[in-house]
Design a protein with these regions (language model features):
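Residue-identity detector for glycine
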Residues: 6, 10-12, 24-27
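Conserved beta-strand hairpin/beta-sheet module of binuclear metal-dependent hydrolase folds
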Residues: 28-78, 113, 173-175, 182, ...
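Metal-dependent phosphodiesterase/nuclease catalytic metal-binding core
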Residues: 53, 147-293, 304-309, 331-334
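Active-site neighborhood of phospho(di)ester-bond hydrolases with catalytic His/Asp-centered motifs
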Residues: 63-66, 83-90, 119, 233-238, ...
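Active-site metal-binding motif and surrounding structural segment of the metallo-beta-lactamase
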Residues: 67-117, 145
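Active-site neighborhood of divalent metal-dependent phosphoester bond hydrolases
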Residues: 110-145, 299
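A short helix->loop->beta-strand "cap" motif at the edges of active sites that frequently abuts
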Residues: 110-114, 286-290, 317
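Short, electropositive alpha-helical surface patch
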Residues: 229, 303-324
Length: 334
């Protein structure tokens, strides 16, 4: 059994925060993420500090923004049209890159607003960061604090905060696509005399139509059951915990920190991080469909093979160790 979650977050009631956008409900076509940084605590020649860029259809999100993230965005071609930034916690290696990033956005002439999300004390720390580059930040900036179970609704998907176990107040995140419409049975629609064209679209939107015969055709006559959306889960910095197991249940991808190896177990306990074996155990317990390890100690910078082997001892599904620039597209579920 894993501990439930960290002591720093009160249970509270879940809140739904709706982004100031037209929020749709038809899911997404594209879900792709790119690792901007995969190193723990300090950068190396090969690995930058924590950062993940997620492309969700037309939207671009950042999860953490370690020092040097904006250069990585240039290097890996993610673009700078970021719609929101989500911070897992406020250790320096996860957020100091926001200072230069905001300044660059201002110098690029950005005019539309940007929202920064994170656990308390997000407002205090991020305001301080903004002030360091204030002479060039000329666009609306909103800072919102999240807690366990809070949800942020965005077009076609929701981002949910998960309270985890770290040395300070920390969150993991679940990006969950809205349910997608069931499959449209073209042959059944034609057999029922449904007019091709707009009536097909109405049925797919859940509206009844009148067939050529005069009979009313219900959506359930030609549209299959709704299909579950994709789920991308990011642990952030954490000890293995039941909250992350629950969050990653049947996830398409679980990105879990794996700072240490087995022989560094005591260090993992002291610093409130996970070993690769523990990350594998979380993925197995959750039934995650794919596990990607990240946030590696510099000791494993160029040769993460031990981490991979130790995670493999616990988890038999698709397994990789992330590297900077690694880009993954999450396929649609059947």
């Amino acid at each position: 059994m894993f501990p439930a979650k960290g002591p720093s977050l009160g249970a509270g009631r879940a809140r739904m925060l709706t982004a100031r956008l037209l929020v749709g409900s038809a899911g997404m076509s594209l879900l792709r993420f790119t690792f901007l940084g995969t190193s723990a605590a300090q950068p190396t020649i090969h690995r930058n500090l924590s950062g993940l860029a997620v492309k969700a259809d037309a939207e671009l999100l950042l999860f953490d923004c370690g020092e040097g993230s904006q250069r990585q965005m240039i290097r890996y071609g993610t673009g700078f049209s970021v719609d929101a930034v989500f911070f897992t916690h406020f250790h320096a290696d996860h957020y100091l890159g926001i200072i230069g990033f905001l300044r660059t956005l201002g110098m690029m002439g950005r005019e539309h607003g940007l929202t920064l999300y994170g656990p308390a004390p997000a407002k205090r720390l991020l305001r301080q960061a903004v002030h360091l580059g204030v002479e060039a930040v000329g666009f609306p900036l909103e800072i919102l604090e999240l807690q366990d179970k809070d949800r942020v609704a965005r077009p076609g998907y929701t981002v949910r905060a998960v309270g985890v176990q770290h040395r300070i107040n920390a969150l993991g995140y679940v990006l969950e696509e809205d349910e997608r419409a069931g499959r449209f049975n073209l042959e059944a629609a034609r057999a029922l005399g449904v007019r091709e064209g707009p009536d097909f679209g109405r049925l797919q939107r859940g509206e009844a139509v009148v067939a050529l015969s005069g009979k009313t055709v219900q959506p359930g006559d030609v549209v299959g059951p709704a299909r579950p959306g994709r789920r991308l889960v990011l642990s952030g910095d954490t000890r293995p915990c039941e909250a992350m197991v629950a969050a990653a249940r049947d996830a398409d991808v679980l990105i879990h920190e794996a700072t240490f190896s087995d022989d560094e177990q005591q260090r993992a306990l002291e610093t409130r991080h996970s070993t690769a074996r523990e990350a594998g155990r979380v993925a197995r317990s959750a039934g995650a469909r794919r596990l990607i390890l990240t946030h590696l100690s510099s000791r494993h910078d160029t040769d993460p093979s031990r981490l991979l082997a130790q995670a493999r001892a616990e988890y038999t599904g698709p397994l990789e160790v992330a590297h900077d620039g690694m880009s993954v597209e999450v396929p649609l579920r059947d």
